């Protein structure tokens, strides 16, 4: 990535969605700087002027003047703007172009909300609600089963251990799922969720975790501590 690119500001360093964006920064070697937003301040006027929804992350790109929030929208912007070689993306109009968006939207509408809710009801809610926990634990396993079945088909088709969601390479679609899976073991006991029950998902995660850009991003945007 050109050294002439000014660092993109990312607001927020904690949580899976900030890491989700950071993975793209590191994979594409996009310079960035972190603006720490304390949890107590995310609903204050200074930050809601940037993100009216009062959530992290958000970004401001001084190279284009664009400010964005919602991690999925940020990822689409970053690959559209900074991945002209299609390292993590696919040519406009190709089947893979649309399939990668399909999986990203499944992550943002399926995995993220359900995994977030199980985390809330397991760790943060003021009282234990077994029925709520049971529902979201089931959804965590259902979403993972969808990925397990699809990755098994991809592995069979590719004939290698590196099965990816789209085509024969890692893409932003794969990376978008990794942060929530990174912390599930911290929040759910093995009798509720165990990645070893999903061998293709585990291999997929291991393949992503073995990448240096992923390791570097996780050192900065730490989860589960």
Give the positions of each predicted feature.
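GST-like domain detector, emphasizing the conserved glutathione-binding G-site
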Residues: 2-134
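Phosphate-coordinating loops and pocket residues in cytosolic domains that bind phosphorylated ligands
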Residues: 49, 210, 219
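Active-site-flanking alpha-helical
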Residues: 79, 180-181, 207, 218
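C-terminal helix/juxtamembrane-tail motif
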Residues: 213-225
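GST-like fold's C-terminal all-alpha helical module
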Residues: 103-206
């Amino acid at each position: 990535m050109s050294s002439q690119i000014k660092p993109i500001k990312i607001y927020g360093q904690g949580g899976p969605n900030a890491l989700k964006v950071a993975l793209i920064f590191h994979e594409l070697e996009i310079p960035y700087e972190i603006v720490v937003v304390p949890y107590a301040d995310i609903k204050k006027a200074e930050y809601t002027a940037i993100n009216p929804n009062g959530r992290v992350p958000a970004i401001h790109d001084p190279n284009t003047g664009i400010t964005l929030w919602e991690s999925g929208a940020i990822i689409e912007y970053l690959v559209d703007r900074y991945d002209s070689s299609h390292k993590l993306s696919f040519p406009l109009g190709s089947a893979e172009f649309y399939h990668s968006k399909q999986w990203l939207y499944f992550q943002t509408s399926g995995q993220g909300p359900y995994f977030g809710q199980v985390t809330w009801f397991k760790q943060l809610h003021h009282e234990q609600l077994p029925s709520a926990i049971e529902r979201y634990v089931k959804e965590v396993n259902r979403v993972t089963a969808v990925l397990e079945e699809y990755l098994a088909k991809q592995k069979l088709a590719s004939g290698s251990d590196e099965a990816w969601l789209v085509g024969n390479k890692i893409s932003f679609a794969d990376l978008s799922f990794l942060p929530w899976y990174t912390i599930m073991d911290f929040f759910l006991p093995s009798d509720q969720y165990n990645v070893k029950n999903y061998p293709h998902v585990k291999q997929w995660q291991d393949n992503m975790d073995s990448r240096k850009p992923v390791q570097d991003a996780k050192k900065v945007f730490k989860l589960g501590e």
